[in-house]
């Protein structure tokens, strides 16, 4: 089994999912767009994961590879029916590429915040085994306003309606960061846009406060990430729980 992972910036990778892949014997190929890597042929890959980044889906002038990336997503999901997991920007790109709508939020959502499963989410194979409400790491200023036609909304929050959704049976978007590790906050505050969002939302001590909160909840968040990962593998392999 081999996963293709698209990274927009060096510090936003698979996180804890990388260890899960290693433990499961899954090979990982990584494309680093920040370093100028090109999109490869999708032949031979079991699944496509697209991670987060500080850019927005509409920033095609500054980041012209976004146009190619959206076409890449359409080919993977629509033409090849390749299992897909998009995290944060990866979730927004999935929506934008497939006819949904992504817009700026009224206020940036940053912090450790609760999301709640929808009725579809409670019974969906990707979310099986998760609690009805869970605390997750949020760090975004744009959101999916409209999921692609025929998609299912799986989770919501009071600040952002679309926290998780499914396109068909094998493509998923997670607005929240279930890949979080103990190094995530420290790494991400090095990105100027993220640091600014953090201070505006949580104040001058926001980085330290968020690191402490993540540390306190990390075991639970990683356990929930493992549930999502295992469920995704079952979907990829066509197994039921």
Predicted regions and their residues:
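N-terminal beta1-alpha1 cap of cysteine-dependent amidohydrolase-like domains
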Residues: 1-79, 202-241
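C-terminal helical/coil "lid" or tail adjacent to the Rossmann-like core of SAM-dependent
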Residues: 170, 179-214
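Short alpha-helical
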Residues: 11-12, 93, 160, 180
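Residues that mark the start of a beta-strand
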Residues: 2, 83, 133-135
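Glycine-rich, phosphate-binding/catalytic loops in enzymes
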Residues: 20-23, 64-68, 101-103, 154-155, ...
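Short glycine-/acidic-enriched loop or helix-start segments at secondary-structure transitions
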Residues: 15-16, 59-61, 95-97, 148, ...
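Pocket-forming structural segment of enzyme catalytic cores
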Residues: 98-183
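Cysteine-nucleophile active-site neighborhood
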Residues: 50-121
């Amino acid at each position: 089994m081999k996963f293709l992972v698209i990274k927009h910036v060096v510090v936003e990778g698979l996180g804890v999912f990388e260890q899960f892949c290693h433990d499961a014997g899954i090979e990982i190929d990584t494309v680093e767009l920040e370093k100028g890597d090109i999109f490869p042929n999708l032949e031979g890959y079991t699944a496509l994961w697209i991670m987060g980044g500080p850019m927005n889906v509409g920033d095609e002038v500054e980041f012209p590879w976004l146009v190619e990336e959206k076409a890449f997503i359409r080919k993977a999901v629509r033409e090849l029916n390749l299992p897909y997991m998009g995290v944060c920007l990866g979730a927004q790109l999935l929506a934008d590429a497939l006819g949904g709508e992504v817009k700026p939020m009224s206020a940036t959502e940053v912090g450790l915040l609760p999301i709640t499963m929808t009725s579809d989410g409670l019974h969906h194979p990707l979310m099986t085994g998760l609690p009805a409400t869970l605390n997750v790491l949020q760090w975004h200023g744009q959101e999916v306003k409209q999921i692609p036609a025929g998609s299912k909304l799986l989770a919501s929050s009071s600040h952002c309606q679309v926290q998780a959704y499914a396109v068909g049976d094998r493509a998923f978007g997670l607005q929240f960061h279930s890949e979080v590790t103990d190094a995530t906050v420290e790494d991400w505050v090095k990105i100027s846009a993220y640091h600014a969002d953090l201070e505006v939302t949580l104040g001058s001590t926001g980085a330290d406060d968020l690191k402490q909160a993540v540390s306190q909840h990390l075991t639970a968040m990683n356990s929930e990430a493992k549930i999502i990962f295992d469920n995704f593998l079952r979907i990829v392999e066509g197994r039921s729980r």
